[in-house]
Amino acid sequence: MHKHQHCCKCPECYEVTRLAALRRLEPPGYGDWQVPDPYGPGGGNGASAGYGGYSSQTLPSQAGATPTPRTKAKLIPTGRDVGPVPPKPVPGKSTPKLNGSGPSWWPECTCTNRDWYEQVNGSDGMFKYEEIVLERGNSGLGFSIAGGIDNPHVPDDPGIFITKIIPGGAAAMDGRLGVNDCVLRVNEVDVSEVVHSRAVEALKEAGPVVRLVVRRRQPPPETIMEVNLLKGPKGLGFSIAGGIGNQHIPGDNSIYITKIIEGGAAQKDGRLQIGDRLLAVNNTNLQDVRHEEAVASLKNTSDMVYLKVAKPGSLHLNDMYAPPDYASTFTALADNHISHNSSLGYLGAVESKVSYPAPPQVPPTRYSPIPRHMLAEEDFTREPRKIILHKGSTGLGFNIVGGEDGEGIFVSFILAGGPADLSGELRRGDRILSVNGVNLRNATHEQAAAALKRAGQSVTIVAQYRPEEYSRFESKIHDLREQMMNSSMSSGSGSLRTSEKRSLYVRALFDYDRTRDSCLPSQGLSFSYGDILHVINASDDEWWQARLVTPHGESEQIGVIPSKKRVEKKERARLKTVKFHARTGMIESNRDFPGLSDDYYGAKNLKGQEDAILSYEPVTRQEIHYARPVIILGPMKDRVNDDLISEFPHKFGSCVPHTTRPRRDNEVDGQDYHFVVSREQMEKDIQDNKFIEAGQFNDNLYGTSIQSVRAVAERGKHCILDVSGNAIKRLQQAQLYPIAIFIKPKSIEALMEMNRRQTYEQANKIYDKAMKLEQEFGEYFTAIVQGDSLEEIYNKIKQIIEDQSGHYIWVPSPEKL
């Protein structure tokens, strides 16, 4: 039977196969907001619609289409073990089951003609199939999808593919779902050949417990190789990552080669490659060891070193279905807090790099038939329980409240993806009776916190589920907060009052990761620099309630964020002292006006302003009818500017500068320059703030006028400006709000990697200049971009410009926080 034929008894199958046969195009799942991609086709080959974090309340309409990259990253197989293959259906029965004991997956349907169903029956050994049950968390299911018959993610494949696993979400906690898995079924809904919006709808309506059937390509077999390597002047000449507590690939404790150092022993030998897995060094087994142990084993070797490595199979080369490159996917996630790609030195034999910190190992109970965290409240034991947790990068992963008047210590919040959450043993509403034998039945909050802090790496907790007591305690806290709020409003004290600011919007001027804040009183909300937040309750001095605002509307998820006061207090404590830097306003040397002095925009304009601690900037929404100017700052800005204009000349342009220099014979006034006859007139215009930047070179004035920029903007083109950070503020004052993007280098080594002709001293100078630039103008940036290659940075910048090119933008508000 042809795969597009249907069973007359199964309307659902008929509709799906009819759609597949006709290839009927419906509106993309991300709604009517999307405009044609100015950077080429974005919806076809490999472009994701980016649905992420399915919520039990609403489904975000779209998280942004990713421009097609110019180069394809090297793909590293994950080696992930896959679950059982569904059994063959019994002839004559219409209810085949997965895993033997699961619910009926195809009621009233005897369809066995689908390609994937034939593969389940073992007709294709390239794929494995798995049933995955996920419990919808606070942030939804925790993954993004792309694809469908109306918008294939992979050429000639209408499947629905997983494009992103969100850290800390339900899918990441479960650990079985992976990027590039193809979703075949959501509960009773077949999504193997449907339009994208149908898959989104199925996930949205799936309920709190979601059963997925997924298909994934089987990992290729590894090749074991023995390599004898003679150390050179740079040691063995390669970098490693991974190990217990420092997983390079989530769920995998292996030690991986992540870099081959140019000119080193490994490169000269030629057999080792990035992505190889180290199994042993000399007689020391490197499987399931800590990162530090692997480094020590490689360091404590003689000149001749015996290595045993596992090389990944070549099946996934240039394969759209291949597993993701986890090296690039996961290492960037923690850059806000520590540079995990920074070199720790060669350690004599090998360069060591710290990777994305993975969650602690999950005990077997996580995959028990009925995990504790899925039990109904009435089924959960009320007897004291013994729980053993192992601290991770986020501590134990839960918050406590109580300790007043002998009321007890209660668990108030469990961090998604943290040790407590992954164990499934601890619940919100648990009363902590003891920690490592220390009795906490009558402890104060401070005593309980101290006991948990001193508990060491392995913590034994005795807890008792007391939801009624905790509920009474919560009610008491709520009443106290209401009293404090009313008192604050009536007294007129405090920084922000709900009664005064019922709808307050701010732009975040820093990155915040809720998983790294152990002091959160309740569910937190993570955000990045430049994100717009709707603060719906700012009455508390320490914590605000807020939700994220996307280009397509407000998120339904409400979370707690640190208040402006708390951010500044913590930062001052970190710095110990507040540093002040006068803003000189000195013009940058650039291509258009080399050697300009700062005679006309000197220290007098911005001098005296403090380097304030950046937290939040109040903003308001404004409608505009022009194309916003674009200012790129930081390393490689010239290359990015050139690429934007050359690739999209119909969308980007440059303005004509002014000068008092006499016109040359081959120059055209108004085309090469606006030639100003009177120096006095140009000086007056500069003083009247009609120029965003100006300076003097060889006794002639040069400058970029606001009117020149406006002329380009009103023609519908983004005016590319090669100017200093001072120009951002001047454009804002002129009601021409630029898209200001700062390229922030990850490290000196990263700069050298992107431009191998640079010396360390040159890269160090560029890095220092970039850090000073961020310190001086950070509050004016629209976005901050980082990447491991120029291609990655360029693609991110294009996406930011597209996101910021609508008719409605967020601009600074005169309100004071």
From Swiss-Prot:
UniProt modified residues of type Phosphoserine: 139
CDD domains, per database record: GMPK, PDZ1_Dlg1-2-4-like, PDZ2_Dlg1-2-4-like, PDZ3_Dlg1-2-4-like, SH3_DLG3
Function: Required for learning most likely through its role in synaptic plasticity following NMDA receptor signaling.
Bias (Gly residues) ranges: 40-53
UniProtKB keywords: Acetylation, Intellectual disability, Phosphoprotein, Repeat, SH3 domain
PDZ domain ranges (all copies): 130-217, 226-311, 379-465
Region (Disordered): 33-101
Protein name (Swiss-Prot/TrEMBL): Disks large homolog 3
GO-annotated biological processes: cell-cell adhesion; chemical synaptic transmission; establishment of planar polarity; establishment or maintenance of epithelial cell apical/basal polarity; negative regulation of cell population proliferation; nervous system development; protein localization to synapse; receptor clustering
Gene Ontology molecular function: ionotropic glutamate receptor binding; kinase binding; phosphatase binding; protein kinase binding; ubiquitin protein ligase binding
Biased composition (Polar residues): 57-69
One Gene Ontology term, aspect cellular component: basolateral plasma membrane
Family note: Belongs to the MAGUK family.
Domain of life (superkingdom): Eukaryota
All copies of domain Guanylate kinase-like, residue ranges: 627-802
Associated disease: Intellectual developmental disorder, X-linked 90: A disorder characterized by significantly below average general intellectual functioning associated with impairments in adaptive behavior and manifested during the developmental period. Intellectual deficiency is the only primary symptom of non-syndromic X-linked intellectual disability, while syndromic forms presents with associated physical, neurological and/or psychiatric manifestations.
Domain SH3: 501-571
Residue numbers bearing the Phosphotyrosine modification: 673
